[in-house]
């Protein structure tokens, strides 16, 4: 009665579940790598921005001190 074709439903479902699990894990790995790359880029940019603001503040302070001493009455 059987023509020799035997369908392994449990095996097919198991393989499908395993494949979906691997795909999901790969998506998590890609998202993880992307977040790590963003963090690696943001860290030096943040430090550079902080250094730039500090330099600008120092320069502005020196300019204000020079202007103040130029305006101040001489004794």
From Swiss-Prot:
Q: Does the keyword Cytoplasm apply?
A: no
Region 4 X approximate repeats: start and end of each range?
8-61
Q: List cellular component terms (GO).
A: chlorosome envelope
The GO terms describing molecular function are: bacteriochlorophyll binding
Secretion signal: which residues? none
Tell me where the sequence repeats sit in this chain: 8-17, 29-39, 40-50, 51-61
Q: Where in the cell is it found?
A: Chlorosome, Chlorosome envelope
* Keywords from the named record: Bacteriochlorophyll, Chlorophyll, Chlorosome, Chromophore, Photosynthesis, Repeat
Q: Name one GO biological process term.
A: photosynthesis
Source superkingdom:
Bacteria
Intrachain S-S bonds: none
Q: What is its main location?
A: other
The family assignment reads: Belongs to the CsmB/CsmF family.
What's the stated role of this polypeptide?
Component of the photosynthetic apparatus which may bind the chlorosome to the bacteriochlorophyll a protein monolayer.
What is the name of the protein in this document? Chlorosome envelope protein B
């Amino acid at each position: 009665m059987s023509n020799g074709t035997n369908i392994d439903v449990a095996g097919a479902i198991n393989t499908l579940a395993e494949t979906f699990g691997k795909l999901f894990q790969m998506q998590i790995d890609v998202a993880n790598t992307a977040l790590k790359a963003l963090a690696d880029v943001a860290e030096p940019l943040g430090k550079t921005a902080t250094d730039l603001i500090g330099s600008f503040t120092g320069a502005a302070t020196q300019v204000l001190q020079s202007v103040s001493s130029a305006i101040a009455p001489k004794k």
